[in-house]
Amino acid sequence: MNTMKKEEIIERLSFLGEDIRENIDKEPYLSMYIKAQQENAWFLKENIQYSLKQFLPWLEKKELHDFVAKYEENKKQKNLAIVCAGNIPAVGFHDILCGLLSNCSLQVKLSSNDKVIIPFLINRMSEKTELPVRFVDKING
């Protein structure tokens, strides 16, 4: 996968924040809530929306810039495997956010109880630029 510049990642993440803010009660989010609940009966629309709203402070450009300024930049893209739990809607999203901001190519193993929300969010961010995120059934490496 291509190495993305940090600014591109920040743009995509802040776009997602705006998208959530503007569309949380509209399509295609409404369809995603239905699919997620079909997969996990505990993932009610209200619970998913609550989780999404908790991400909003992380998805502000200023917050993202402040966050990355605290760390030395990885010049060379590294591979990172993330195994997501499934007890809270999109619980692995913060790990993905940190991996992207750290210039990592991600292998993400989703929980069997949450295979809808995170791919949906990555898809929303990837509309203009492909992100270095690959969903896998088994972590290799």
Question: What is each model feature region?
Answer:
Residues M1-N79:
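N-terminal Rossmann-like NAD(P)+-binding subdomain of aldehyde/semialdehyde dehydrogenases
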Residues Y33, L64, K70-G141:
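Rossmann-like NAD(P) dinucleotide-binding subdomain of oxidoreductase/dehydrogenase enzymes
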